[in-house]
Amino acid sequence: MKIEELKAYEIKEHRFIEDLNSDSYILRHKKTGARVALLLNDDNNKTFYIGFRTPNMNSTGVAHILEHSVLCGSKLYPIKDPFGEFEKTSVNTFQNAMTYPDKTIYPLASCNETDLNNLMHMYLDAVFNPNIYENEMIFRQEGWRYEIDENTGDLTINGVVLNEMKGVFSNPDEIFSRNIFDSLYPDTEYGFESGGDPEVIPELSYEEFLDFHRRYYHPSNSYIYLYGNMDMAEKLDFID
């Protein structure tokens, strides 16, 4: 099947990009409004990416915590760490997720088409059907939680992202850079710490965390990108 024959998508633009030696398409998914960019060429390192606009209006690190959390089990992959399990068996050339001040992206690449399909399936189910609504402990594990120190009995705060950002904020260069952005872009997503300020992260509630997913992790707010030598029509039909 040709891309032009797919009824679920509207072709907004189609042209050949000589500098990239690629046939390019910009599409819109009719049912959801999701945007799709395609670069079809002879590169066997096939790439898939889904991203969402996730502006941060505070420094609680909600987008960063959500990036971690959606990869901790989903409707079709109800295990603690499907991302890690796929890493053990996949032959991918790249598999990651990143949070920026204004977006969150989930990119992957593989030279094996079956491997790419498996990873795409896992990523799409993770972002749209995560287990975060059924299991609050995912938020507590990846974000923040109270703990009692077994030795001293003191009340402490722990969490994967919290501890990661404590490491970031222990670097003077990072603190200097953060203060520059605070000064240049006050009260915007670029002036806040998208990764989360360790002193502010505990202000994030579970309900606010879920609301952030409901608001931004929707197909209408997504951008999907496919690149390389593959059956693009088959991939688009699968995504639909």
Q: Residue ranges of each PLM-predicted region?
A:
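Beta-sheet entry/capping signal
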Residues: S24, R35, T47, I105, ...
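Active-site recognition of the HExxH zinc-binding catalytic motif
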Residues: T60-C72
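Short pre-active-site segment immediately N-terminal to the catalytic Zn-binding motif
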Residues: G51-G61
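Short, hydrophobic/aliphatic alpha-helical segments
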Residues: N41-R53
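N- or domain-start disorder-to-order transition segments that initiate the globular core
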Residues: M1-D43
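Charge-rich, well-structured scaffold segments of protease-associated domains
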Residues: M1-K7, P55, S69, G73-D240
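Short, solvent-exposed loop/edge-beta patches enriched in aromatic
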Residues: K30-T32, D43-N44, M57-S59, S74-L76, ...
